[in-house]
Regions:
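Ferredoxin-reductase
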Residues: 1-80
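Short, surface-exposed secondary-structure boundary micro-motifs
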Residues: 39, 87-88, 230
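FNR/FR-type flavoprotein reductase catalytic core
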Residues: 71-216
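Short Fe-S-cluster ligation motifs
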Residues: 235-239, 243-280
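Short, Lys/Arg- and Gly-enriched loop/turn segments at beta-strand edges
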Residues: 42-51, 89-96, 237
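A generic structural signal for residues embedded in beta-strands
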Residues: 36, 84-85, 227
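Structural signal for conserved beta-strand scaffold positions within catalytic alpha/beta enzyme cores
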Residues: 6, 51, 154-156, 209, ...
Length: 280
């Protein structure tokens, strides 16, 4: 069992948890992920490692309440335990050779962008961290983000905090203002990562995207997380999650991501009814 030692609500839909998992913490690196299971009847869910403390033996995860399992996870508190917490899985983010970069996080992707930006910043790279939220009430980890970069740019859809607009607009302005990036890292919704990759393609800026497709076993056996990258089949769990954004078939990835929306909605509705006793 893996005890939850800290729970922190970041906004109305996003929660941070620290989980006691010393073996995972000992080996974890930025960009890797874990797969957890709440109990014997639970599904296996992948979450990117948002942080780790090797001395305390803890791993930090950040999740958004979007379906049955994340709703159930959010109902747990400090002192409760998870049945399974497997990892670290996937390839860590490669920081070698990166000197001036833009790390872009959209929505919950900010939680994944944070450890990658911090690793690059700690390694001596000049990091512009561009993060986007719908409004100021959804902003998370602001203090941590400021400490993890050279320059923090906050974008909100409604202009309630930082600059009004989208992360792609902020990246475009940075490039137009003469920022000479050797690498761009984009993490977040597939349409955003696709837009960033299309923007940097003609400029020949190396672009890395973090892919989080449907995943079950995390070892490459089930094939659920397969992607087409450069015309070849890759598996996000073992070959990724980081890939060359100029080679990823985003349209295929988006189509696969929509495959089980109806089933996910029904599971969430059933969970709500079980919790409240209400019929919908």
């Amino acid at each position: 069992m893996y005890p939850i030692v800290k729970k922190r609500v970041l906004n109305e839909t996003v929660t941070l948890m620290e989980v006691q998992a010393p073996l995972v913490a000992r080996k974890a690196m930025p960009g890797q992920f874990i797969i957890f299971r709440i109990d014997e009847e639970g599904e296996r869910v992948p979450l990117t490692i948002a942080g780790y403390d090797r001395e305390k033996g803890t791993v930090t995860i950040i999740f958004q309440k979007v379906g049955y399992t994340t709703e159930k996870l959010d109902s747990l508190n400090e002192g409760d335990s998870l049945l399974d917490f497997v990892g670290p899985l996937g390839e860590p983010t490669k920081t070698e050779g990166i000197h001036r970069c833009a790390v872009i996080g959209g929505g919950l992707g900010v939680a994944i962008a944070y450890p990658q930006a911090k690793a690059l910043h700690d390694a001596g790279a000049e990091v512009d961290l561009i993060v986007g939220f719908r409004n100021e009430h959804l902003i998370i980890l602001k203090d941590e983000l400021e400490a993890a970069c050279t320059n923090l740019i906050i974008m909100t859809d409604d202009g309630s905090n930082g600059n009004k607009g989208f992360v792609t607009q902020a990246l475009q302005k940075q490039i137009e203002d003469g920022r000479d990036y050797d690498t761009v890292i984009a993490i977040g919704p597939l349409p955003m990562m696709k837009a960033v990759s299309e923007m940097t393609r003609p400029l020949k800026i190396k672009t890395i995207v973090s892919m989080n497709p449907i995943m079950i076993d995390g070892t490459g056996m089930c094939g659920g997380c397969r992607l087409t990258v450069g015309g070849e089949t890759k598996f996000a769990c073992v070959d990724g999650p980081d890939f060359d954004g100029h080679l990823v078939d985003f349209d295929e990835a988006m189509a696969r991501g929509r495959m089980f929306r109806a089933e996910e909605a029904r599971a969430k509705e059933k969970h709500f009814c079980n919790l409240t006793g209400e019929a919908r």
